[in-house]
């Protein structure tokens, strides 16, 4: 792929100005070399400290790919069995379940049946079950009442940081070492990532995290659970310095910090199928689709990696977000032999839009144009109605908070999607797409528009969460 450096720089500068970002780092690599690496804006606004390739970033959930590589190395060496029961490996963890046993393979794929809080009663305090004031949790003792399981393992998908905390505990026990030391030796030392840290203790050269004013969804939630509303004052027109530094309690799910330069090294290793951390065949197995609710939706789940289609191009990778101030993107396009790293010291839902703008500048015209066509009467009558999150409040707490119920309604001969919370809080027009027989495109104005699947009575958003039609529920 021929890289237009000037176009990339101009795009990055325009994005920083358009979205009033504190700072951003961009790295582009091939399997052989770093093609571009630079910082834009500030790692700290108040002191006007520049964002550079050496600025240290909290990479959040990209950590999961490192935990996955370490675990798969143990699998390859015969030290860990993907079919092993989790309770056999960590007997002190109890699962409150009437379902089959959770196996190691379920932890890799967010299909274990657990969610973003251990128990239903933790709804109002779910954050403190994930974030800590003083470093990582003692995983076996972090769940004194056990962890609720809401669906048969392997049959559904919902994001679960706690599952990755447990997988990290398993890796540590198998190696008879701490997870932090395992990642240091297996990943950082192996690849020469000398400015990377498995833990998230603040270090010199680290960017300051910023966020924006609370949106309606956050305000609604905080009022509902009785949290104190603490706004903070912008240090410029819009960016608010993080009021509190939270540690990732489930460290193996998201505690790594690294410079952009080191993450480019990591991306090059992944384009080379791990550079010897595991064999190429085992690495290929990590990219095989383990869960996909609809084959026509772009995002699917491998082992630790999300597998997706972006502008018609095959890609894999992961995003990472840290509450209070950081978003990170890692995308690898193996058929094009390039990878992209984006470091933002801003906690914001803007990250997907920013990513699409940068990828579009790199790729030019999409390989596949998504055609939008009107929805005919037969299709319309099948999809109109209200769709509810499936039973299981613990496992599905994230989509319940971010979307809630979804309705497909008709206004002035057009169909609209509307959610109780989130980006479709205001009704947004939808069209039929030629991308797949059950695929509809949301007319959200994005250069990479959102796709949804409606297959029978099941609506699936391109985040792998599925909702079922409730014929008794009323539209609003």
Predicted regions and their residues:
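Short, conserved catalytic-motif segment at the N-terminal edge
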Residues: 2-59, 79-81, 141-147
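Short, glycine/proline-biased beta-turn/loop segments that scaffold the active-site neighborhood
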Residues: 82-96, 191
């Amino acid at each position: 792929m021929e890289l237009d450096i000037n176009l990339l720089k101009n795009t990055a500068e325009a994005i920083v100005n358009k979205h009033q970002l504190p700072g951003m780092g961009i790295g582009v690599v091939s399997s052989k070399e770093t093609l571009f690496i630079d910082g834009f804006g500030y790692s700290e606004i108040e002191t006007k400290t520049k964002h550079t390739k050496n600025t240290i970033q909290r990479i959040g959930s990209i950590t999961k790919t490192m935990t996955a590589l370490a675990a798969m190395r143990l699998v390859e060496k015969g030290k860990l069995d993907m079919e092993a029961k989790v309770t056999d490996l960590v007997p002190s963890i109890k699962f409150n379940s009437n379902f089959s046993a959770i196996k190691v393979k379920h932890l890799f794929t967010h299909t274990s049946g657990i969610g973003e809080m251990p128990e239903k009663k933790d709804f109002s305090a779910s954050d403190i079950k994930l974030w800590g004031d003083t470093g990582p949790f003692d995983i076996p003792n972090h769940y004194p009442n056990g962890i609720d399981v809401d669906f048969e393992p392997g049959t559904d998908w919902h994001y679960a940081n706690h599952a990755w905390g447990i997988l990290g505990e398993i890796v540590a026990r198998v190696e008879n070492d701490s997870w932090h030391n395992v990642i240091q030796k297996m990943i950082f030392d192996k690849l020469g990532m000398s400015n990377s840290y498995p833990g998230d203790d603040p270090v010199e050269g680290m960017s300051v995290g910023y966020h924006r004013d609370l949106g309606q969804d956050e305000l609604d939630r905080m009022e509902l659970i009785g949290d104190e509303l603490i706004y903070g004052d912008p240090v410029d027109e819009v960016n608010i310095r993080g009021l509190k530094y939270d540690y990732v309690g489930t460290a193996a799910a998201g505690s790594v910090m690294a410079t952009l330069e080191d993450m480019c090294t990591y991306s090059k290793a992944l384009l080379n199928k791990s550079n010897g951390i595991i064999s190429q065949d085992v690495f290929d197995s990590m990219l095989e689709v383990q869960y996909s609710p609809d084959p026509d939706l772009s995002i699917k789940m491998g082992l630790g990696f999300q597998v997706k289609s972006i502008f018609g191009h095959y890609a894999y990778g992961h995003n990472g977000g840290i509450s209070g101030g950081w978003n990170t993107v890692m995308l690898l396009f193996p058929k094009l032999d390039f990878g992209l790293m984006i470091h933002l010291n801003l906690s914001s839902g803007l990250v997907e839009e920013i990513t699409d703008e940068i990828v579009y500048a790199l790729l030019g015209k999409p390989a596949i144009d998504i055609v939008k066509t009107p929805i005919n009467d037969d299709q319309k009558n099948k999809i109109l109605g209200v769709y509810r999150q499936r039973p299981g409040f613990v496992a599905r707490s994230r989509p319940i908070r971010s979307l809630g119920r979804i309705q497909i309604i008709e206004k002035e001969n057009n169909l609209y999607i509307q959610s109780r919370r989130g980006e479709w809080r205001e009704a947004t027009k939808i069209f039929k797409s030629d991308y797949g027989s059950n695929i509809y495109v949301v007319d959200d104005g994005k250069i990479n528009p959102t796709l949804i699947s409606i297959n029978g009575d099941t609506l699936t958003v391109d985040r792998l969460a599925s909702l079922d039609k409730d014929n008794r529920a009323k539209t609003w």
